[in-house]
């Protein structure tokens, strides 16, 4: 997909991002159990949320968290959510989301970015592996931790 760009989350784009139609079944993998447990420990000032736009249409959403002092290493530079509209999947939107979050992590002086996902076969593990993430551990809740060196 050509001409992808990021925009900060706004009232208008948030509604569109929340209305993205995913491939059936993907909504089950949007928020790993680990993130559900640690969400309250995040400093919202360190959260980076962007919509991904193609033309004038929101086709994706990415949220990451950057806090080099967080007590959980896998949450210091973490992709929190990558959502891509079903109609835009397989067209580079997810890759763009990860690359954009990686660039933001670098701007914070971080040398890696992590993602946490359910290890279920239908989860996003293959997607992250194709982008260069390697399995680097399992959370206390049984989710897979993947790390990408920047």
Tell me what each language-model feature is:
Residues 2-4, 8-80, 85, 104, ...:
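Acetyl-CoA-dependent GNAT
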Residues 85-87, 91, 120:
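Active-site acidic-Proline motif in GNAT/NAT acetyltransferases
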Residues 90-103, 126-130:
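Conserved acetyl-CoA-binding loop-helix of GNAT-fold acetyltransferases
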Residues 91, 108-111:
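Short coil/turn segments at alpha/beta junctions that flank glycine-rich nucleotide-binding fingerprints
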Residues 114-125:
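Conserved beta-strand-loop-alpha-helix junction that forms the acyl-donor binding cleft
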Residues 121-122, 140-144:
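Short acidic/glycine-enriched loop/turn segments that link adjacent beta-strands
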Residues 128-138:
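Conserved acetyl-CoA-binding loop of GNAT-fold acetyltransferases
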């Amino acid at each position: 997909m050509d001409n992808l760009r990021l925009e900060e989350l706004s009232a208008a784009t948030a509604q569109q991002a929340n209305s993205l139609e995913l491939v059936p079944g993907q909504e089950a993998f949007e928020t790993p159990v680990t993130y559900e447990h640690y969400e309250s420990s995040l400093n919202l000032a360190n959260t980076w949320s962007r919509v991904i736009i193609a033309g004038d249409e929101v086709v994706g959403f990415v949220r990451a968290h950057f806090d080099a002092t967080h007590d959980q290493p896998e949450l210091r530079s973490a992709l929190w959510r990558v959502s891509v509209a079903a109609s835009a999947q397989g067209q580079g939107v997810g890759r763009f989301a990860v690359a954009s979050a990686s660039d933001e992590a670098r701007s914070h002086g971080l040398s890696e970015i992590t993602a946490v996902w359910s290890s279920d076969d239908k989860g996003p593990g293959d997607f992250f592996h194709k982008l260069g993430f390697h399995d680097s551990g399992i959370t206390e809740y049984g989710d897979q931790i993947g790390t990408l060196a920047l």
